[in-house]
Amino acid sequence: HAGQAGEVATDALRYVCDCNHYDAVKMAIFENLVIEGLGGAEIIVEKKGKYLDVVVKQTRWETVFWDGHSRRKDFKDANHMGHATWMYVEDIEVLYGEKAGKVAEDSLAGVGVGGLAWGSYDDRPTVGQWLDYKHKRVLVVDMYCKYKGRWTRSLFCNGGDLIEPMVSEYTDEFGEPVCPIELASVYVDRENARYGLVRGMIGPQDEIN
């Protein structure tokens, strides 16, 4: 029976990897590790009709953020991490409901919770930018944070929460909430900055310049 259970588990993992084109995802993450020094993925569950699918999504290095005090290469000492993504207001309503859509719409109308905002024409989040008036988009932050020792999730934009903050839906084998984002880095310097192999190829004089 133990052997059969092992085969079932192996088949299940192989199925998840095949559905997510895992080899391609791994290569993309590896490229981020080598060049930018940081790579990872978010392992989540998505409902598709009456089925639940395990989805492995690469976290783009330019959109992800983490606890600046984290020193471990696997980020296991981080107290928060997440990613910031530009989203159209209409897509927010489809994904998170009418109330969330209203919060995003209010952001563009100037009813936000604060912070600076400019009309952005860039698809990559920039410090200080929360709103893209031209394309009716808002910067959506999906953040997992340890609160009283438990991982919680918040999803918000400049206008406020898009969903109610909650304990993470994902748990470990002991039933404890976990963060579904897995990150890794190649090197960590004394200032906790992450970097990859490419930085070591830069000559001393070029680095000074």
Where are these regions (language model features)?
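Extended alpha-helical, oligomerization-prone segments that build pores/tubes and scaffolds
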Residues: 1-209
